[in-house]
């Protein structure tokens, strides 16, 4: 086969572009199906506690005691979205509030995590919130410039 293109083209004459891969985030633990019951705030740090710990993602999926810490939370960019009727598509009603206001105003709650998303300085949880005998879909966005730390009991 004779190839007469330039070094910036492939065999079909298409200009090659540089490809950079953002590796998938493989967290050692998941909060999927865990029930968040408390946010403790110390300065710009959040300690998020669940009713029954965390689940390891190493294939065994063992449940372990633990909680999650977020450091250097940027409160002006951290939000909670409370969406109306759960599980439906189409139009909805809801409320957006600062995460700090949510933590201050809603003390007794259960937030069942269904999905976790990790991005650049951002952790997002989607799930269902139960508070004051109300049930709604909920999205919690935590913008943190510091580390996210999974704290577990070392049973070795």
Model region roles, listed by residue range:
Residues 3-156:
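Surface-exposed, interaction-prone regions used to assemble/regulate multi-protein complexes
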């Amino acid at each position: 086969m004779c190839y007469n293109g330039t070094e910036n083209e492939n065999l079909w004459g298409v200009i090659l572009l540089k490809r950079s891969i953002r590796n998938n985030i493989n967290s050692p633990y998941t909060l999927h199906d865990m029930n968040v019951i408390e946010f403790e705030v110390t300065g710009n740090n959040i300690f998020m506690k669940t009713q029954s710990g965390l689940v390891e993602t190493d294939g065994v999926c063992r449940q372990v005691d633990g909680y999650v810490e977020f450091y250097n939370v940027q409160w002006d960019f951290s939000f909670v979205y409370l969406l109306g009727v759960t599980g439906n598509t189409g139009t909805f009603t809801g409320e957006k509030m600062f995460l700090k206001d949510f933590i201050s105003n809603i003390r007794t709650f259960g937030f069942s995590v269904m999905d976790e998303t990790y991005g650049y300085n951002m952790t997002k949880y989607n799930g269902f919130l139960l508070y004051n005998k109300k049930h709604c879909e909920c999205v919690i966005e935590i913008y943190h410039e510091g580390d996210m730390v999974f704290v577990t009991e070392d049973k070795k």
